[in-house]
Amino acid sequence: MTEFLHSPLHAEHEKLGATFTPFGPWEMPLKYANELDEHRAVRNAAGLFDLSHMGEIWVNGPDAAEFLSYCFISNLVPLKEGKAKYSMICAEDGGIMDDLITYRLEETKFLVVPNAGNACLLYTSPSPRD
């Protein structure tokens, strides 16, 4: 039997009757009772999504925006403090390795949030280009 990683909210999801599914190395809640009821609740009130499993890559320094723009398909230089941008990182052959969100927290401080299974891969992937 595979041992999955669990978010800090796993016990709460269990108490609420979640049905779980594998997501990379994580076991994540897929649904609770009825999908239509969940949909209506989100449309009429609010919905929460547990992001505990997502990766976090911190990039700091005077050239952080230029470095991230080099690594991703988006130009992050004009991104204003307190804003975020959805982007992607591509493999050498042009295929998409992952989609991610980058937050500019300060002028020289960024938080990159990749999908859970790709955080380690992305952390080690940027390499010099010819």
Predicted feature residues:
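Acidic, proline/glycine-enriched N-terminal capping motif
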Residues: 1-90, 95-97
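Helix N-cap motif at beta-to-alpha junctions
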Residues: 62, 115-119
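Phosphate- and divalent-cation-binding pockets in alpha/beta enzyme and binding domains
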Residues: 67, 121-122
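Glycine-rich, Trp-frequent "lid" loop and neighboring beta-strands that shape
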Residues: 101-102
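Conserved small/polar residues in nucleotide/adenosyl-binding loops
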Residues: 123-130
